[in-house]
Amino acid sequence: AIYYNEKHKPLGYVVYYLRNEVFHIKEIVALNSEARHGIWNYISAHKSMLNTVVGFNYSGEPMAFLFEDSEMVENIEPYIMARIVDAEEFFLEYPFPLQPDFKIHFRIHDEHAPWNDGDFAVWWEDGKTCCRRVEDAPDVNLVELNIRTLTAMMLGYKRPSYLYEHEYLKTEYYMLQILERLIPVGKPCFSDNF
């Protein structure tokens, strides 16, 4: 089912099937709140035919909060694992929303990929991100973390403040504030696999 706005522009969809009074959601995508409401109205229009709605939420958004009167069970299960394989290339391609006028030094610990284990300087020139491995990064603008933490932070799974608070990330408080602005809010969604 596709949700269209008043101008007949598609803004979301739900892939589903009905079986034994269960509405099975295979995939649901809404580009804005209007589409989200429209899709859920469509699903609720089937309530006379079903007892249960089952599906997966790839966004990590707590669904129970969105429903005023719902009896809902939510389970959190890892769906996909991620790992930064090449930190230097990752930094070069990352869509940083702003470009500070100073270098940030990342001290990365990676016991499985020696090319990632070490210090990296990241800076911006002429609208481009630059990155290179350095020997003994200075303590100024230093962020120290392991590759797992870097992956979780850069992909939006955990915010820098959370990682700092739980001692997965070591840095000065001013750098923590910069990281919070430098890393976009939101999580990538891999709703299909190969």
Q: Residue spans of the language-model regions?
A:
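Intrinsically disordered, low-complexity, positively biased terminal segments
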Residues: 1-194
